[in-house]
Each structure stands twice: as structure tokens, then as C-alpha cells.
Amino acid sequence: MRVIGLMSGTSVDGIDAALVEIQGEADAIEIELLGFTTYSYPSKLREKILAVCAGEKLSALEFAALDDEIAHSFATAARQLQERYGKAELIGSHGQTIFHRPPNGNLGLSWQLGRGEAIAQQTKLKTVSNFRRADLAAGGQGAPLVPKVDAYLLADPTKHRCIQNLGGIGNVTYLPPKNQTDWENYVIGWDTGPGNVLLDLAIQKLTNGAQAYDQDGIWASQGTPHLDLVERWLADPFIEQLPPKSTGREYFGVDFLEQCWRDAQDLQLSEADWLASLTEFTALTVQRNYELFLPQLPDEIFLCGGGCRNSYLRKRLQAAFGNQIPVRSTDDLGLNHDAKEAIAFAVLAYWRIKEFPGNLPKVTGAPCPVLLGEIHCPY
């Protein structure tokens, strides 16, 4: 089956669209990436999404209009992908997260805009959306949802692997070797903290919005991290919170960054030193989470997501783990690091119509496996 996966993460960089050929049943699947592109949001829409993520209030009418505008962009991305790579049979659309609140004595909340019924109508393709709601309703975090896909596509027969996503938020999937008895039951994953979000927000602050991100981490690489300040930031409660755990821009967002800026100003750090310190903090949140919560450190780490293109961040991650644990890209495993999340939601959509649960209770904290996603059929 030819399935489109659509994904826009917390960085709001654009809509990643992957056309994937999927064969097999349940966990015995094979995939082939047929085509991939990133559809850029119209600039005004991106600005609106970021403003809402930062807390801008909307009326009910404005909220509904934004939902429809995002759905139109997702449908456009799916149509453009098919014009280039051929017709699909199914769409799995993650949508655009604008708010995520983990469970805290009550059910968690996670809002993804870009309603699936509108995408189905505009593309004339069956569409699966709202993947997080069933897990949240069962009492889980609703995130991360990719670890089960990672397990069946990227686990190694003999090596312990970590798949580290560096989107706006960072998250890890730990994969034990497949030669271990009941290895699937030992797959774990959680959000590690910030990925690109603080680095991107910092660049936007320093350039008054003229620059969206630090290409290759060049600006940050010109500075020196202030290690005492980094350690102070690492004392944040989320870093040492036991998994299952998830987070978003609501936590690691503008307010968090402004406190980091005030801290840097108090120490009279240069802009480059501040960026270097934020990069070091991001790298060490990953290392600290592994050290605290993995059953053992991995034999190898594979990166995916936008942060994979930040050469300086990759360098600092490698330094954090030393020479004993290689830090590479999922490209080395034959899985495009930019397309990986979109591929995952294509697989989750395929699993949904095959009635195969897509969550891992040990990862999300849900009490049981559940079917992920709501199915919308065009008329």
C-alpha cells in the first residue's frame, strides 16, 4: 500500500511529506521511501502558529479558522507530493501541535490542528489523524508515539541502539538487541527535553526574527559554553523526572529561554557564548537522560530530525558521550533523517487501518495497547 505520512513538529519549520510503500502485516512490515518533500508554511500562517503556541488567545471562530487553514496546507502538501511521485491510497497526518500538557493527576491534553476530515475531502483519500488522543484517553502521555515504529524498523540483532530525534523537542527510543529474549518488551522511550527549540528561539531573538535558525550551528561554534551555567540549567526538574514523560514548547519555550537570557546577561556572556551554552545544555540533556534512565548505555546512537543538520550540536553530542559511543545519523541505517518522522506516521496510519495498536504502554504510560488515530473517509 502507498501511504503518505504528514508531519509538522514543534519547530514549525514546515510540513514534511513522505510517500511510503508499506507491505506486510502488523509488526512484520517492510517499507520503501518513494518520495519526500517539505512544504513550507505560508509565512503569515507560520507566524500565527508560533504566536498561538506562545500563548496568544483566540476566539472560537479564530481557532476553527486556524484549524481549517492548517488542514488546507497539509492537503496541499499531500497533493504536491503525489504530483511529483505518484498516487497514494492512504494518508497519516500528525497535524500541527499547538498545545501539549502531560497527565498530572488527570487526563493529559494534546491539540493537533489540521483536521483529518478536511484533509480527506480535499485530497479524496482516506485519512488517519489525531493519533495521540486514544493514548491520552487511556491515561497515557500521548507521546512519544514513534518508538514502536523505531523498534520494528531499526532494531539490531546484537547491538543496543538509541534513536535520538532532535526536532523542536528531543526524544529517545532505546532498542535492545533482537537476539534478547522478549526484546520488544524492553523497548522504552521518552522526551529528553529541548531539541532545536531553544536554539531556534535564541537565534530569532538575537536577529529580531530575520534569521530562523543557526545554520550548521556556526554562530554557536564561535562561542565557549559557560559550564557552571549549563549545570544550573540541567537542574531543571524535567531533566530528572522519571519516564514516562513528555514535554513541549509550553515548558521549553519563550519563558524558559528568557530566563536563560537573563542568566547569561548576569554573567555578561557574549551572544556566541550564550548560544554555545544553550547548545551544550541541549546536548547534555540527552546525555543526562541516558545516564539516569537507560538500563545501560547504548552501543551506538543514531540521530534524526532537524537538529541532525546542526554540525556543532552533533559535535557536542559526540563529546558528551566520548569516543566509545558513535553518534551518527539514521541515514546510515537507510532511513532519511529528515523524512523519518513523516515515515513513522505513514506506518501508524497503516497499522490503524490494519487494527494493530500503535502505542507502547511502557513508553507512554498508558495501561494497555490502543489503536491510534481517527479514520476519515472522503465522500
Swiss-Prot record:
<keyword id="KW-0418">Kinase</keyword>
<keyword id="KW-0547">Nucleotide-binding</keyword>
<dbReference type="InterPro" id="IPR043129">
    <property type="entry name" value="ATPase_NBD"/>
</dbReference>
<dbReference type="GO" id="GO:0005524">
    <property type="term" value="F:ATP binding"/>
</dbReference>
<dbReference type="GO" id="GO:0016773">
    <property type="term" value="F:phosphotransferase activity, alcohol group as acceptor"/>
</dbReference>
<dbReference type="InterPro" id="IPR005338">
    <property type="entry name" value="Anhydro_N_Ac-Mur_kinase"/>
</dbReference>
<dbReference type="GO" id="GO:0009254">
    <property type="term" value="P:peptidoglycan turnover"/>
</dbReference>
<comment type="pathway">
    <text>Cell wall biogenesis; peptidoglycan recycling.</text>
</comment>
<comment type="function">
    <text>Catalyzes the specific phosphorylation of 1,6-anhydro-N-acetylmuramic acid (anhMurNAc) with the simultaneous cleavage of the 1,6-anhydro ring, generating MurNAc-6-P. Is required for the utilization of anhMurNAc either imported from the medium or derived from its own cell wall murein, and thus plays a role in cell wall recycling.</text>
</comment>
<dbReference type="Pfam" id="PF03702">
    <property type="entry name" value="AnmK"/>
</dbReference>
<protein>
    <recommendedName>
        <fullName>Anhydro-N-acetylmuramic acid kinase</fullName>
        <ecNumber>2.7.1.170</ecNumber>
    </recommendedName>
</protein>
<keyword id="KW-0119">Carbohydrate metabolism</keyword>
<keyword id="KW-0067">ATP-binding</keyword>
<comment type="pathway">
    <text>Amino-sugar metabolism; 1,6-anhydro-N-acetylmuramate degradation.</text>
</comment>
<keyword id="KW-0808">Transferase</keyword>
<feature type="binding site">
    <location>
        <begin position="9"/>
        <end position="16"/>
    </location>
    <ligand>
        <name>ATP</name>
    </ligand>
</feature>
<dbReference type="GO" id="GO:0097175">
    <property type="term" value="P:1,6-anhydro-N-acetyl-beta-muramic acid catabolic process"/>
</dbReference>
<dbReference type="GO" id="GO:0006040">
    <property type="term" value="P:amino sugar metabolic process"/>
</dbReference>
<dbReference type="GO" id="GO:0016301">
    <property type="term" value="F:kinase activity"/>
</dbReference>
<comment type="similarity">
    <text>Belongs to the anhydro-N-acetylmuramic acid kinase family.</text>
</comment>
